A protein has these predicted regions:
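Sec-dependent signal peptide recognition
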Residues: 1-9
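Generic serine detector
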Residues: 5, 13-14, 20, 33, ...
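N-terminal targeting sequences that direct proteins away from the cytosol to non-cytosolic compartments
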Residues: 11, 15-67, 71-72, 161, ...
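Conserved polar/disulfide-associated segments of primarily extracytoplasmic proteins
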Residues: 55-189
Length: 212
């Protein structure tokens, strides 16, 4: 997921970069990646594979995302698994990913930065963003996002230059907590409840993802 400083670079650029289709393959609850990284990513057997998308994000990064969900019979999403492979294009040699989260976790011997947040469905979305792409993919397959969600973002940097990353975002419907995104955000009347919800969410996310 690109940082805001990197996104600003695109406005002075007329670069057009082409991509082919997705490189990684998904079978059931498993993604197999032959490179960057060479890995097998396993999710719970209860997930449904929604599909994949690949495009050049803001003209500067080759992105390939795969979406999985756990949903009710009416296709209301209860849990979202968003797996994304991302690298800056060669035409932008000075760009690199920057993460400063003090929290880390290990999955399959890989070190991941850990961030969490809550989000309401009605919040504004950046045009052309990876979120716009994944939500369009979900809608096209008939799935509905919850009114409020909580997310864990796990990011593993693949190279010393910090130009390539594996990002896994796990999201859950907030409804079972009894709180809304606005209530749990800083300044909200239930923000003091967020630390425990946050810790439990990270634990669940870490337990649902296996990398070999």
């Amino acid at each position: 997921m690109l940082q805001a400083s990197a996104i600003l670079v695109i406005f002075g650029s007329s670069l057009l970069v082409q991509t082919s289709g997705p490189e990684r393959t998904a079978r059931g609850n498993v993604i197999v990646s032959a490179r960057e990284p060479k890995a097998r990513i396993e999710l719970p057997k209860t997930v449904e594979y929604v599909g994949a998308d690949r495009w050049v994000l803001y003209g500067i990064a080759d992105c390939e995302l795969h979406a999985f969900v756990e949903a009710d019979p009416n296709k209301n999403i209860q849990r979202l698994y968003w797996v994304q492979f991302e690298s800056y294009v060669p035409e932008k040699p000075t760009l690199k990913h920057e993460y400063n989260s003090p929290r880390h976790t290990d999955i399959g011997g890989m070190d991941f930065y850990v961030d969490t947040w809550v989000r309401a469905k009605a919040e504004q979305m950046r045009p052309g963003s990876d979120r716009e792409h994944i939500e369009a993919l979900l809608r096209a397959k008939g799935y509905q996002m919850p009114v409020n969600m909580m997310y864990v973002r796990l990011v593993h940097l693949l190279d010393e230059q910090k130009r390539k990353e594996l990002m896994i975002i796990y999201g859950e419907d907030l409804k079972p907590t009894g709180f809304t995104a606005a209530e749990l955000k800083e300044g909200g009347n239930a923000h003091d409840r967020w630390p425990k919800i946050d810790r439990d969410l990270i634990d669940r996310a870490s337990g649902k993802i296996r990398i070999r």
